[in-house]
UniProtKB/Swiss-Prot annotation:
Bilayer topology annotation: Peripheral membrane protein
Subunit record text: Dimer of heterotrimers each composed of an alpha, a beta and a gamma chain. Alpha and beta are catalytic chains; gamma chains are involved in binding the enzyme complex to the cytoplasmic membrane.
Binding site for [4Fe-4S] cluster 2: 26, 244, 247, 259
InterPro entries registered for this protein in UniProt: 4Fe4S_Fe-S-bd, Nitr_red_bet_C, Nitr_red_bet_C_sf, NO3_Rdtase_bsu
Function: The nitrate reductase enzyme complex allows S.flexneri to use nitrate as an electron acceptor during anaerobic growth. The beta chain is an electron transfer unit containing four cysteine clusters involved in the formation of iron-sulfur centers. Electrons are transferred from the gamma chain to the molybdenum cofactor of the alpha subunit.
GO molecular function, one term: nitrate reductase (quinone) activity
Protein name: Respiratory nitrate reductase 1 beta chain
Residues holding [4Fe-4S] cluster 1: 16, 19, 22, 263
EC number: 1.7.5.1
Lineage: Bacteria, Pseudomonadati, Pseudomonadota, Gammaproteobacteria, Enterobacterales
């Protein structure tokens, strides 16, 4: 057993209001520069819908994630090394700019320079940020399907409608929607790492954050196809790939990510999980896709177990990280209460950004008296959002974990409503779903109140264990350019503008 730690995230979809604050703040901090105008490290999608980029969940089209071969071994869906090499100069599974959107701005200067007395109202026409040319029509945007914007024929192409009679949901009275904030999953078994020909992508040992080395990246873009969540973007200015960095400078300082800090709905939770690195391959190679969720749970370790603590210390896990894992809200939601579920575990990447399924539209329908009940709780299988749809999204089609999570949330609400409104303690609903009163009270505190100190339990990094970064900063500078690879050629395979790098190598004493 080899114990490692990972900073994970849980998003409570039951409270997401779709305000896009997380997307805007992330955009302003990380991708408000030339070359990545179209890139959104964090975006909020409305489901049902095809998402951003279009149809990103269709792995028959994009070939992302892993597949299990007949011999039980894993292989990138793109193919083996020889197949990857054969596609290196022409990747047919790469999303194009039209699958995202052509970034644009408006000719606001035209409003200022329009002559007085003009017979027509001056307008600010859209202009492409890539070509600089005027655009006749804006065809798409990052939230083009926001709030079910668009006809149902396009929304019905959502892959999560598989095995569902989706025709009935085209009728107004059966319409449903939910918000799905998405960011890089920082997987335990990342396919992007395996498909990068340059070996530029790596997973940090201390916190599990997946990063791209901008010095090593050569812009092959195989990682974009390899990532099943399509959360890696190509910077056409620098010729490099970029992705969500989980705000690691903030994480190292013990602070939450920008998207978590600015979330007005308090839906995001950050915490440490301890896991067995030796069990990753066995879990990801599980034959039945519906068992992948449980196999990933088996990878996580109990931070309160004395044997786990002893082994973690031997494996170099600091005590502060172990203590943070014992108070982790992510561990409580994923392991103890089993409310949080992984996004598309069938991709076999073992994602580490999990989601609590939405309950609000279901509960409102139950309050209206339109639904039957199953014992104390409403019959969740007959409620507004199809359980099978949520299962296709979060548990590879297995409805049992979805039903358990929804019933436990309903039971907690039933218990607290009886306590606060009726002034009595009614534990029948809790007993029905296997919860204690103490667990229900704690769930209420974390889900409803969601205090800052409960949502974010992030240990600061141990800088005494890190190598001094000043020589690297002095020699190269922390830039998004070509880095210090020492190239002096002007040839560019992808016909994009490159930033000339200055070859400066710092001389430092060897680290003891």
């Amino acid at each position: 057993m080899k114990i490692r730690s990972q900073v994970g995230m849980v998003l409570n979809l039951d409270k997401c209001i779709g305000c896009h604050t997380c997307s805007v703040t992330c955009k302003n901090v990380w991708t408000s520069r030339e070359g990545v105008e179209y890139a959104w490290f964090n975006n909020v999608e409305t489901k049902p819908g095809q998402g951003f980029p279009t149809d990103w969940e269709n792995q028959e089209k994009y070939k992302g994630g892993w597949i299990r071969k007949i011999n039980g071994k894993l292989q990138p869906r793109m193919g083996n090394r020889a197949m990857l090499l054969g596609k290196i100069f022409a990747n047919p599974h790469l999303p194009g700019i039209d699958d995202y959107y052509e970034p644009f701005d408006f000719d606001y200067q035209n409003l200022h320079t329009a002559p007085e007395g003009s017979k027509s109202q001056p307008i600010a026409r859209p202009r492409s940020l890539i070509t600089g040319e005027r655009m006749a029509k804006i065809e798409k945007g990052p939230n083009w399907e926001d709030d079910l914007g668009g006809e149902f024929d396009k929304l019905a192409k959502d892959k999560n409608f598989d095995n569902i009679q989706k025709a009935m949901y085209s009728q107004f009275e059966n319409t449903f929607m939910m918000y799905l904030p998405r960011l890089c999953e920082h997987c335990l078994n990342p396919a992007c790492v395996a498909t990068c020909p340059s070996g530029a992508i790596y997973k940090r040992e201390e916190d599990g954050i997946v990063l791209i080395d901008q010095d090593k990246c050569r812009g092959w873009r195989m990682c974009i196809t390899g990532c099943p969540y399509k959360k890696i973007y190509f910077n056409w200015k620098s010729g490099k790939s970029e992705k969500c960095i989980f705000c690691y400078p903030r994480i190292e300082a013990g602070q939450p990510t920008v998207c978590s800090e600015t979330c007005v709905g308090r839906i995001r939770y950050l915490g440490v999980l301890l896991y067995d690195a030796d069990a990753i391959e066995r879990a990801a190679s599980t034959e039945n896709e519906k068992d992948l969720y449980q196999r990933q749970l088996d990878v996580f370790l109990d931070p309160n177990d004395p044997k786990v603590i002893e082994q973690a210390i031997k494996d170099g896990i600091p005590l502060s990280v172990i203590e943070a894992a014992q108070q982790s809200p992510v561990y409580k939601m994923a392991m103890e209460w089993k409310l949080a579920l992984p996004l598309h575990p069938e991709y076999r990447t073992l994602p580490m950004v999990w989601y609590v399924p939405p309950l609000s539209p279901i509960q409102s329908a139950a309050d209206a008296g339109e639904l039957g009940s199953n014992g104390i709780l409403p019959d969740v299988e007959s409620l507004r959002i199809p359980v099978q749809y949520l299962a296709n999204l979060l548990t590879a089609g297995d409805t049992k974990p979805i039903l358990r999570a929804l019933k436990r949330m309903l039971a907690m609400r039933h218990y607290k409503r009886a306590e606060t409104v009726d002034g009595k303690v009614d534990t029948r609903a809790l007993e029905e779903v296997g919860l204690t009163e103490a667990q229900a009270q704690e769930m209420y505190r974390y889900l409803a109140i969601a205090n800052y100190e409960d949502r974010f339990v992030v240990p600061s990094s141990h800088r005494e264990l890190a190598r001094e970064a000043f020589p690297e900063k002095n020699g190269c500078g922390f830039t998004f350019g070509d880095g210090c690879h020492g190239s002096d050629t002007k040839f560019n395979l992808f016909n994009s503008r490159r930033i000339d790098a200055i070859d400066v190598t710092s001389k430092t004493e060897p680290h003891p």
